[in-house]
Amino acid sequence: MSRQILVTSALPYANGSIHLGHLVEYIQTDIWVRFQKMRGTNCRYMCADDTHGTAIMLRAEKEAITPEALIQRVWAEHTRDFAGFHIGFDHYYSTHSDENREHASKIYLALKDAGLIEVKTIAQLYDPVKNLFLPDRFIKGECPKCGAADQYGDNCEVCGATYSPTELKNPVSAVSGATPVHKDSEHYFFKLGDCEAFLREWTTSGTLQAEAANKMQEWFAAGLNNWDISRDAPYFGFEIPDAPGKYFYVWLDAPVGYMASFARYAKDHGLDFDAWWGKDSKTELVHFIGKDILYFHALFWPAMLKFSGHRLPTAVYAHGFLTVNGQKMSKSRGTFITASSYLDQGLNPEWLRYYYAAKLNGTMEDIDLNLDDFVARVNSDLVGKFINIASRTAGFIHKKFDGKLADGVGNIELIGEFQAAADTIAAHYEARDYAKALREIMALADRANQYVADEKPWELAKDDAAVYRLHEVCTVALNLFRLLTLYLKPVLPKLAGEVERFLDIPALTWKDARSLFIRQAINAYSHLMTRIDPKSIEAMVDANKQNLEPTPAPAPARHAEAQAHAAQAVEAPKTETISIDDFAKVDLRIARIANAEHVEGADKLLRLTLDVGELGPRQVFAGIKSAYAPEALVGRLTVMVANLAPRKMKFGMSEGMVLAASNPDGHKDDVPGLFILSPDSGAEPGMKVK
């Protein structure tokens, strides 16, 4: 029986445009789905817009339109952008649908019947001007732990502390600017902690990548809190069935959108919903997500499914973040690039599909879009290697042989090598290691180009006695080109379609790797792909800079990046003097940054693994994400405070503090206002700084 797979990508929020960072996931998923379909798998790709929440409601109010009108407009924009990058959803829906309401309500009622829903009265902050309870992210104030200003209502991006919004000092509503008041409200909680035994087993069953499974152990060690799944009116979403005036929190009904999208698709195509989503379904369910939403997909979602009587995910594949030129995407640098602005500049979407594929390796590592490398790699690989094979040989078929390939091939061994690579390349695609797949394919392209260079068809064409040889050489070259096209088709579907029309062949499937391409009339060759002009990339960056609207300068107290380290241990004003004995208490050590990575759910922090010599490895959270890409830090030496008391943070234990210099005005002229300290050459990990 052939495989049956239901594949999803995370649902983009209907409150903004698709940008190049989003596209990493959708391109990654689309390549995998296209590969599966080429292999003959019954594979369906579902997605939808995530449409509920306070942010949607407030934006619609600001634009003086209904939330429904807003999400319909954004849905049209998203579907247009996805189509522009050849993302081949089988169905793209909306979480604001009858199907989603039905399935979210059924899941909730099943969890309630299972004793996993409890009701508690909690104190919340309430905006007396807008008459609404404020979500955590719509409250700003001073961190109750370190005193940093302008922090969100749930966690501090300076010291990493987590807290209740009611603990925030001097809170202000981000909606109206009013001072919130305390107000009690009944809320509904999913008892996630009661599901821990199941989740511990499920997360170590091979469903997650190894690095994701390891992350789960950290969260288990910290303890699983019950999950608030309700919000008070006014709220744009679905009302809880037995709780008037209470609405499902957006993160409850968002993943249910996967089910709802398929439910509508199944209805339209006569499919059995339970055969795909039922408890005993044999269908593979595969979720592609960003690593920032791993908590929801590896804990909340499987627990919801398990205890509501549904099947569980077969696999949850998380990918890393995108940086551009080694740094976080930036509007001021013109590297916060939307999908539409890329397309509006006339850039080929398959250039980006290829480049992302060349970087994606199936892990949670971040990938970098280096714009200079982007130009060089696409021009070299796709035009200089792949397209070059056809452009140097196809013309002779029409000029000399009436557009028909030879009856046989003279180098069956070389073609056999290309055919034999099909299984290896397929294994790389299956494992989502597209980088390895493309390296294999480009190595074959090099072999094909060497064959053409050795045979010199342009020289053979001058010799009437070599006409038979010319025919065979060009036929062999086009056989190799056809096989390369087949292998690249999941990544370059539009280009593959153009090649299929040029070669006058049916749509390529994976089994076609076994066949020869002879005695076939082909169409006249026309140019298949142009090189990237570096000026077009510069124009895109400039266009994204020019599209910026002026924004107010941030409050001077904000500068979380510059305060990130000092705020962890501030005990006295900076003007106070200390004795040499006080200073001697601080154990400063040289440390080598062995690893650096983004922290899920934190906008400013990086997780650093430090080698401190005889003191061993240390984990430190540093608020330097705005200034450094993780990969730029690995291997560097820096200075750390080694005897700072360990601090339990939301994301794990921080075992010290690295030192950094800061610009008192934050960023100036787009130069990061934060600089980690590095010792002179000769310093080694563990050495004391005196």
UniProtKB/Swiss-Prot annotation:
<dbReference type="Pfam" id="PF09334">
    <property type="entry name" value="tRNA-synt_1g"/>
</dbReference>
<keyword id="KW-0479">Metal-binding</keyword>
<protein>
    <recommendedName>
        <fullName>Methionine--tRNA ligase</fullName>
        <ecNumber>6.1.1.10</ecNumber>
    </recommendedName>
</protein>
<dbReference type="GO" id="GO:0005524">
    <property type="term" value="F:ATP binding"/>
</dbReference>
<keyword id="KW-0067">ATP-binding</keyword>
<dbReference type="GO" id="GO:0005829">
    <property type="term" value="C:cytosol"/>
</dbReference>
<dbReference type="Pfam" id="PF01588">
    <property type="entry name" value="tRNA_bind"/>
</dbReference>
<feature type="binding site">
    <location>
        <position position="159"/>
    </location>
    <ligand>
        <name>Zn(2+)</name>
    </ligand>
</feature>
<comment type="subunit">
    <text>Homodimer.</text>
</comment>
<dbReference type="InterPro" id="IPR029038">
    <property type="entry name" value="MetRS_Zn"/>
</dbReference>
<dbReference type="GO" id="GO:0006431">
    <property type="term" value="P:methionyl-tRNA aminoacylation"/>
</dbReference>
<dbReference type="InterPro" id="IPR002547">
    <property type="entry name" value="tRNA-bd_dom"/>
</dbReference>
<comment type="function">
    <text>Is required not only for elongation of protein synthesis but also for the initiation of all mRNA translation through initiator tRNA(fMet) aminoacylation.</text>
</comment>
<dbReference type="InterPro" id="IPR014758">
    <property type="entry name" value="Met-tRNA_synth"/>
</dbReference>
<dbReference type="InterPro" id="IPR001412">
    <property type="entry name" value="aa-tRNA-synth_I_CS"/>
</dbReference>
<comment type="similarity">
    <text>Belongs to the class-I aminoacyl-tRNA synthetase family. MetG type 1 subfamily.</text>
</comment>
<keyword id="KW-0030">Aminoacyl-tRNA synthetase</keyword>
<keyword id="KW-0648">Protein biosynthesis</keyword>
<dbReference type="InterPro" id="IPR004495">
    <property type="entry name" value="Met-tRNA-synth_bsu_C"/>
</dbReference>
<keyword id="KW-0820">tRNA-binding</keyword>
<dbReference type="InterPro" id="IPR014729">
    <property type="entry name" value="Rossmann-like_a/b/a_fold"/>
</dbReference>
<keyword id="KW-0694">RNA-binding</keyword>
<keyword id="KW-0862">Zinc</keyword>
<feature type="short sequence motif" description="'HIGH' region">
    <location>
        <begin position="12"/>
        <end position="22"/>
    </location>
</feature>
<keyword id="KW-0547">Nucleotide-binding</keyword>
<dbReference type="Pfam" id="PF19303">
    <property type="entry name" value="Anticodon_3"/>
</dbReference>
<keyword id="KW-0436">Ligase</keyword>
<dbReference type="GO" id="GO:0004825">
    <property type="term" value="F:methionine-tRNA ligase activity"/>
</dbReference>
<dbReference type="InterPro" id="IPR033911">
    <property type="entry name" value="MetRS_core"/>
</dbReference>
<feature type="binding site">
    <location>
        <position position="146"/>
    </location>
    <ligand>
        <name>Zn(2+)</name>
    </ligand>
</feature>
<dbReference type="InterPro" id="IPR023458">
    <property type="entry name" value="Met-tRNA_ligase_1"/>
</dbReference>
<dbReference type="InterPro" id="IPR041872">
    <property type="entry name" value="Anticodon_Met"/>
</dbReference>
<dbReference type="GO" id="GO:0000049">
    <property type="term" value="F:tRNA binding"/>
</dbReference>
<feature type="binding site">
    <location>
        <position position="156"/>
    </location>
    <ligand>
        <name>Zn(2+)</name>
    </ligand>
</feature>
<keyword id="KW-0963">Cytoplasm</keyword>
<dbReference type="InterPro" id="IPR009080">
    <property type="entry name" value="tRNAsynth_Ia_anticodon-bd"/>
</dbReference>
<feature type="domain" description="tRNA-binding">
    <location>
        <begin position="582"/>
        <end position="690"/>
    </location>
</feature>
<dbReference type="InterPro" id="IPR012340">
    <property type="entry name" value="NA-bd_OB-fold"/>
</dbReference>
<feature type="binding site">
    <location>
        <position position="331"/>
    </location>
    <ligand>
        <name>ATP</name>
    </ligand>
</feature>
<feature type="binding site">
    <location>
        <position position="143"/>
    </location>
    <ligand>
        <name>Zn(2+)</name>
    </ligand>
</feature>
<dbReference type="InterPro" id="IPR015413">
    <property type="entry name" value="Methionyl/Leucyl_tRNA_Synth"/>
</dbReference>
<dbReference type="GO" id="GO:0046872">
    <property type="term" value="F:metal ion binding"/>
</dbReference>
